[in-house]
Regions:
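The alpha-helix within a helix-turn-helix
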Residues: 202-203, 490
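Short glycine/proline-centered loop/turn elements that form peptide/ligand docking sites
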Residues: 194-198, 482-486
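Membrane-water interface segments at the C-terminal ends of transmembrane alpha-helices
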Residues: 30-67, 82-192, 220-241, 245-247, ...
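A short glycine-centered flexible hinge/capping loop motif at secondary-structure junctions
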Residues: 108, 205-207, 493-495
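Glycine-rich helix-loop "coupling/hinge" segments at transmembrane-helix boundaries
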Residues: 70, 241-266, 350-353, 528-558
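Transmembrane alpha-helical segments of polytopic membrane transport and secretion proteins
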Residues: 1-40, 289-330, 407-414, 578-590
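Short, membrane-interfacial amphipathic segments enriched in basic
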Residues: 17-18, 22-26, 67-78, 83-84, ...
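Juxtamembrane inter-helical linkers in multi-pass membrane proteins
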Residues: 65, 73, 208, 297-314, ...
Length: 590
């Protein structure tokens, strides 16, 4: 398989019969480089993901009186499955997870379809700006969104009279806020490439606009809608920070229950069972998402010969188009813009409504119960996110480079598919499980006398684990679109494997790599689940500080949390606006 990945140069340019030895040396070098490209990410994932997660889960399944490390302990007690699954609370949490994810998915699709039509099928001045506004919520840190909607629904907020604070409705609305752009971008990008002639033919035959939509347009959009719905369900089912802030003790998901069981009750058996249960749910959802995505790709391939996309202006929308425009305007202004605007306004006012900058001045004061200020936490967040982004881009870039190869053998193709799937696992495992697994595993690992939990690299490594799948999905489509004959031609002309990568692959992935850096940085900046376990008191990140502030009573603490959330939102949005400028035509969509 390795010789297929990097064809060795023939060496026919070498004089005096040295071609074979030179070609053999270059072939050996190529194989060594490809082995390293697989081994380095594999070792990273094994040490910093598979080992901690397996240790965490196995520790929960060890017998209660077992004192040895669970990986090597013969004392097993799988009765924890029956005990935990027999608790009414467990099934209540599972039911709430599916209920919240189901409601969030349905509402996101229903509201996102009109937005996809307006923003991708129609054209108007400022459309690119509106698209950017729609995209920003998806990359905002979860604690920022949680604080923003909490400030809307709490008693002193604009919607406090509705009694929705810490309710199921508040959670679902926040989930739609996050995932609206997933539907708009996934369905809209597909819709923009649909051939308009079938719709025109149906209208010419007398079909009403509603019937055209029902019998022609929606069936054609079905693969994209299914793909978007599966992704939204996945994001809703694994939501953590937003649900933890808005749900309180009444509402939660499997993800938040793992956190509660681990931090408040030290019930590792329950946390382990719930982690396995979440893995099963996520695996099923990702399988459905993969099938739907494959259908969407095949449908796009069939559209390849269709005429170029034809966007219509907003004039002459008709009743259906006008309704889509109205729904989109209400969603963008009311659901996306208003919560963040309210967050900014509330951060500039006192509890009695007076305008002030005191909340921002408080960012320079130590947070209650800590010697760290919010500004210091912001600096820590920027530094750790930068390190995490570098790690994620290096590891994720190597994975994408290897997976993009096209081996001739079926075994080679299956091996690369397996490698791709393994590096997607961090998407399906609770960040809480990863974080606590770090604490358990790195406490003098393998009998070493060094406690690695005090290392300053622990937080960025955990954040990088979460960001690697995003880097892979951003860069991989570009590498797969590269014609392999270009690499083969360069190798035939005598270029070594490293030079082939530098002169053929790298120039094409520079812009997508910039986008991947932005995504990795933004994800790491707002990561909360694993960081909540690993951040030391003197090096807390800004999301951790915000969560601590809203957990303390007093209007001053909440006002400081609002100001800190605004700072975090502005930094994240700025990073993503810059990163989006690096997007190429074939860069992956998240």
């Amino acid at each position: 398989m390795t010789t297929t990945l990097a064809p060795a140069p023939t060496g026919n340019r070498a004089p005096h019969g040295d071609a074979a030895p030179g070609g053999a040396r270059r072939g050996a070098t190529g194989r060594a480089l490809w082995f390293a490209a697989v081994a380095v990410p594999g070792l990273f994932l094994a040490v910093f993901f598979l080992w901690p997660v397996a240790t965490m889960i196995l520790k929960g399944f060890a017998a209660p009186d077992a004192t040895a490390h669970p990986v090597w302990s013969p004392a097993w007690d799988l009765g924890g499955f029956g005990e935990v699954l027999g608790r009414p609370r467990t099934w209540r949490v599972v039911g709430l997870t599916f209920l919240q994810a189901g409601l969030g998915t349905v509402l996101s699709v229903l509201l996102g379809l009109p937005g996809a039509y307006v923003l991708y099928r129609r054209t108007f001045p400022g459309r690119a700006f509106v698209r950017a506004v729609v995209t920003v919520p998806f990359v905002l840190p979860t604690v920022v969104v949680g604080v923003a909607f909490r400030s809307l629904f709490m008693d002193a907020g604009p919607l406090g009279g509705l009694g929705l604070d810490q309710s199921l409705t508040a959670i679902v609305v926040a989930l739609v806020f996050f995932n609206y752009s997933v539907v708009v971008r996934t369905v809209g990008g597909f819709w923009a490439q649909l051939d308009a002639r079938p719709e025109q033919a149906a209208r010419a035959l007398g079909a009403s606009p509603l019937r055209v939509l029902r019998t022609v347009t929606l069936p054609a959009l079905a693969p994209a809608i299914a793909s978007a719905a599966a992704l939204v369900f996945f994001f809703c089912a694994t939501a953590f920070g937003t649900v933890l802030i808005l749900g309180g003790s009444r509402f939660g998901t499997i993800e938040t229950e793992i956190y509660v069981r681990t931090t408040q009750f030290l019930d590792l058996r329950a946390a382990a069972v719930l982690s396995v249960l979440q893995l099963v749910v996520v695996a099923a959802v990702l399988w459905v998402s993969g099938r739907a995505s494959a259908r969407r790709v095949r449908a796009l391939a069939l559209l390849g010969a269709a005429p170029g996309e034809r966007r219509l202006r907003l004039r002459g929308l008709g009743a259906g188009g006008a309704a889509s425009l109205a729904v989109t305007a209400v969603v963008v202004l009311g659901l996306l813009v208003w919560p963040m605007t309210n967050l900014l306004v509330r951060s500039l006012r006192t509890a009695d409504g007076a305008w002030t900058l005191q909340n921002y001045r408080n960012l320079a004061e130590p947070v209650a119960g800590s010697s760290v200020t919010a500004w210091q936490a912001a600096g820590t967040s920027l530094r750790t996110a930068a390190v995490a982004a570098v790690i994620a881009v290096i590891v994720g870039g190597l994975v994408a480079l290897v997976v993009s190869r096209r081996p001739r053998s079926r075994a080679g193709r299956r091996g690369l598919a397996l490698l791709d799937g393994v590096f997607m696992l961090p998407l399906g495992v609770s960040a809480v499980t990863v974080g606590f697994g770090f604490l358990v595993t790195l406490d003098r690992p393998l009998g070493l006398g060094v406690d690695l939990r005090a290392s300053g690299l622990l937080v960025p490594v955990a954040q990088a684990v979460v960001a690697i799948p995003i880097v892979v999905r951003t860069v991989l489509p570009v590498l797969r679109a590269l014609d392999p004959r270009l690499r083969e031609a360069a190798a035939t002309l005598g270029a070594r494997p490293g030079r082939v990568l530098a002169t053929v692959d790298l120039p094409l992935v520079t812009r997508p790599l910039g986008l991947a850096v932005g995504f990795a940085f933004a994800v790491s900046l707002g990561e909360f689940g694993a960081t909540a376990f690993l951040a030391r008191p003197d090096s807390a990140t800004l999301p951790v500080v915000i969560f601590r502030l809203i957990g303390r009573p007093g209007a001053e603490n909440f006002g400081t949390a609002l100001a800190a959330a605004v700072v975090l939102a502005v930094v994240t949005a700025t990073v993503m606006v810059v990163a989006e400028q690096m997007r190429g035509d074939k860069a992956g969509e998240l």
